[in-house]
Amino acid sequence: MDNVNKIYIDIDYDRLRKEMYDLNVDQFLIENEGQMSVQTIPGTPVDKQPLSGTLSLQVDWDSHDASDPNSKPKKRDVVLEEKDFTEVCDFLKGTYTEEVINMLTQEYKVVRGRYMMMNWKSCLTHHIDQTPRIHLPLVTNKDCFMIIDGKLVHLEQDITWLADTTLMHTALNSGRHLRFHIVFCLPPIEDGRTENQLEFDLE
């Protein structure tokens, strides 16, 4: 598997974008550190669902003092698992976005889906994920990139992408406008295969 590959699946990106704006998701992201869950753990109260799977599930970055070179974020008291975020959040019930989530769940068993916004002139930490990610770029610009295993890639808008984020990577928006993606995690492999041995409908 290359660092990024196209997934050929029929998604109406215009409808996804329209629903994002109609549901005021963009405003929620601006007010809540750029993330909003689209999948949650079954039984999560409705009012807790939108933030239930956001930010790091392992560490609390609020405990990190960036001015101290020896500071490290502490591990969360309760560490959640990506694979447990399987239920579509209530605010998306009956929407086209729910249809897309269900389609991706059927095809790829996706978990812990989130809307993710990147502010202009910003980037993420350099890190690795437990499993690859599926990206649905809703709004992007030519100055948005991922760097995966040292290679610079641009995820074009309105194309569904599989990114091998089990490699060291980051993402950056060096443009002048906000970037909006929907991002899904693939589930952990249970049969001994590595993530790179998965088969997809790729180019």
PLM features: what roles do these ranges have?
Residues P137-E156:
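A short beta-strand-loop-beta hairpin characteristic of the jelly-roll/cupin
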